[in-house]
């Protein structure tokens, strides 16, 4: 009887925890570690509180993804020159996001690839998408066999490079893994007019899985006007945006302003600063750090 009571108690607590988790009405927040371009930085940023990272991807003249590299200039207070070969970084990232791996970081649930397509001609965008997909499929998703589990956002700086999205999707389909597009989202990062961004997605045939970024280097100031426009689109009921993130946010006051505006993600050089603000009395009952169970393509409903 005692054993039965103990089992019942454990089951009751588990059920209560599950109900409480589903009943949590706080907005999930993605704390996005900025400019994570060396494998060693993955652990560094996650250990500081990031549940997602942003990684720069440079391309060679033939539209092959080549390095995880930003270069000069970059954010104030950061080294701009850390890098890896792209495929080596993907392997390190796979280790960090594959359950059971010795390097596994359970908190790391989303990766934004900041695609530096400015070096490419417009007519290379589709090919860049195909080559990016082939590399991710082999080195990150392990050809669909127990690869990394993180969600991926393809962030494109130029609206004219929307064919990259189709190239990426077509390549995964060609290689027999169209289901992996369930793990892929999209972002145009050039701070273009929201309407123009929407038109680019129409041309690309994309509806859903849309993150909208807004921001500027931490060396400069930028207001929240466009962030609020993106949030209005997200919350309109008929907009194309699912999530909004703001970059680069390093100060507590800026973090509070972004949270007050209603963002879903904050990209930062200092994840611990964002974590501290989320734990403040004014925010801890409204926001929480997103977990893997939070769908990054789902528009949060209050």
Swiss-Prot record:
Cofactor(s) listed: Mg(2+)
Coiled coil: none
Signal peptide: 1-14
UniProt KW keywords: Cytolysis, Dermonecrotic toxin, Disulfide bond, Glycoprotein, Hemolysis, Lipid degradation, Lipid metabolism, Lyase, Magnesium, Metal-binding, Secreted, Signal, Toxin, Zymogen
Propeptide: 15-22
Positions of the catalytic residues: 34, 70
Annotated S-S bridges: 74-80, 76-219
TM annotation in the entry: none
GO cellular component: extracellular region
Chief localization: secreted
Sites where the protein binds Mg(2+): 54, 56, 114
Annotated family: Belongs to the arthropod phospholipase D family. Class II subfamily.
Name under which the protein is recorded: Dermonecrotic toxin LiSicTox-alphaIA2bii
